[in-house]
Amino acid sequence: EDVDHVFLRF
């Protein structure tokens, strides 16, 4: 899971 990465994308 890359949940923390999704937030960085925004």
From Swiss-Prot:
The lineage of its organism: Eukaryota, Metazoa, Ecdysozoa, Arthropoda, Hexapoda. Belongs to the FARP (FMRFamide related peptide) family. It is found in: Secreted. The modification Phenylalanine amide is found at F10. GO terms for cellular component: extracellular region. The keyword Phosphoprotein does not apply. Is either amidated (Sa112) or non-amidated (Sa12b). GO terms for molecular function: ion channel regulator activity; toxin activity. May be directly involved in a paralyzing effect, by inhibiting muscle contraction, or may also act centrally to modulate prey behaviors. The non-amidated form (Sa12b) potently inhibits ASIC current in rat DRG neurons (IC(50)=81 nM) when preincubated before activation by acidic pH. Has no consistent action on the time course of desensitization or the sustained component of the current. Has no activity when coapplied with acidic pH, suggesting that the peptide needs to interact with the channel during its closed state. Keywords: Amidation, Ion channel impairing toxin, Neurotoxin, Proton-gated sodium channel impairing toxin, Secreted, Toxin. Expressed by the venom gland. This is FMRFamide-like peptide Sa12b.
